[in-house]
Amino acid sequence: MLLRALRTGEPMYIIIAVLAAAFLVFCVIPLHEFAHAWAADRQGDDTPRNSGRLTLSPMAHVDPIGGVLIALIGFGWGKPTPVNPRNFRNQRWGEVLVAAAGPASNLLLGWLFLFIEAVVMHISAISGSILQMSIATFFEYAATISIFLGVLNLLPIPMFDGWHILEGFLPNGSKAKEWVWRNQRTLYIVIIVLLFTGILSYPVSALSEFVIRFFAWLSALPFGG
């Protein structure tokens, strides 16, 4: 993310990218992990609470290496939220809800950012303020990243929350589950290679763009959009 902005050499774009990266690392990622912790707590598991993860403090959720990678290239990770599914009131559905909470927080936050952008754009269209246009660009940038991470995490493949959601619908003793657990290290390497080469990013970006357009349309409705 920052690397792409630096390559443009445009000061305003670089400033917006720096602000968006900081917002992503210190707001979006902590909210994602907090959502997992909150959902687990609501399902009866006090593991996140006892681990100090039921908080929005970035220090509890940001992984140093993952945070740096997110800022630089737009892909990384936070500290995994510890949960014990055995404590859930309903183990199967509890796992689904807890896994879905993280990506859902990213999508809802992205929608909120797009709504704020729509408000600022409506005001700037009247006043013609360059500062307001820059603020709108920042929120659009932040929304794009947040929604991209939400869609990415919903992929039903190992390493992402989408896989844990899918697991909740697979029968116990499923061959698919067993195969994934036996080959998870190899799968992680393959997925990381696909992400860093951009092969996996293209379809995720296309789906994210569809979600962004839908949320942008909803956000513009109050202003006659």
Annotated model-derived regions:
Residues 1-225:
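Hydrophobic transmembrane alpha-helices and their immediate loop junctions
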